[in-house]
Amino acid sequence: MQTVLLSIYLILIFFIILLYRKLHRTKEGKIKIFEARLNHDELLSYAEHLSQNHTLSKKAGNIDHLMRHLDGNYRYINATYKALSTSEVQRSVPAAEWLLDNFYLIEQQYKETKQNINRKFYRELPILDEGNFGGYPRIYAVIVELLSHNDSSADKNILIEFLNSYQSYATLKNAEIWAIPVILEIALIEIIRRQCELIRESMEEFGLAEEILKSPDGVEEALSKYIKEGPSTSLFEHLLMLMKRDNSDYPEVISAIDEKLESINMTAEKMIRAEYLKQTDDNG
């Protein structure tokens, strides 16, 4: 019965996937959310692992918790979009440029999802009792886990295989199968929100880089303080980009950055070259 339902829903899921791909396609391809991508066999094994470790709550299902979470995710994305409109960071972060170009699609998807939710139906969805997704529908956790560990891909064949592997230990209810198209839409908003968190971090580091270059104490002294605190390589990238933009020449800064990057087998020169090659690929 489960296999039949999955087959029936292929058409609906196909259209959701088309929207997903449109949302996640940039000049160089889709947005990559996580580094820890699982291969095909690992992904299916992980589905079985999830199934064995998920514990369902005895409480009645409630979609309100998920809807509040969806609203919060959208507000965060919206705030990031507005902040980017007046920030130069979009020039150095491909995901930021993508968000500016595609926000209208995200907004449209969010509004349609809110309109299409049948709260009475979604109350039938089993809720997880504990863990990161405690209080959320089980099918939502399953879909988010799939996207998180599959390079954010919603390929229909992988989706079906993942769900079938999950059901090796725990059978999904019919209501969960029927809910997949809308749950996918909500999960996509979750994934985009996570990307926005990375964009926000990059914006903060861009601002910090500007502060360092404008420091009244001098660039070298300001940078030395932050180097002791162990800044990320992203801060260095922003510094180099701003120096290039302003045609600034700070050999001491380059030397200090090189010294810090040496421990990870990277140099400022390599970073500049890598950025140049990336921009060349983007424009090609």
Predicted regions and their residues:
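Juxtamembrane/interface segments at transmembrane-helix termini
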Residues: 20-27, 200-204
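ATP-dependent phospho-/nucleotidyl transfer catalytic cores
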Residues: 31-134, 210
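Extended charged low-complexity segments that act as oligomerization/scaffolding linkers
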Residues: 190-198, 202-206, 214-230
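Feature marks short, highly hydrophobic, charge-poor N-terminal signal-anchor/signal peptide-like helices
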Residues: 1-8
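Extended, charge-enriched "interface" segments that sit outside catalytic cores
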Residues: 29-63, 234-284
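Active-site activation/catalytic loop segments of kinase-like enzymes and analogous catalytic loops
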Residues: 135-177, 184-201
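Alpha-helical transmembrane segments
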Residues: 12-22
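Nucleo/cytoplasmic regulatory scaffolds in medium-to-very-large eukaryotic proteins
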Residues: 20, 67, 74, 97, ...
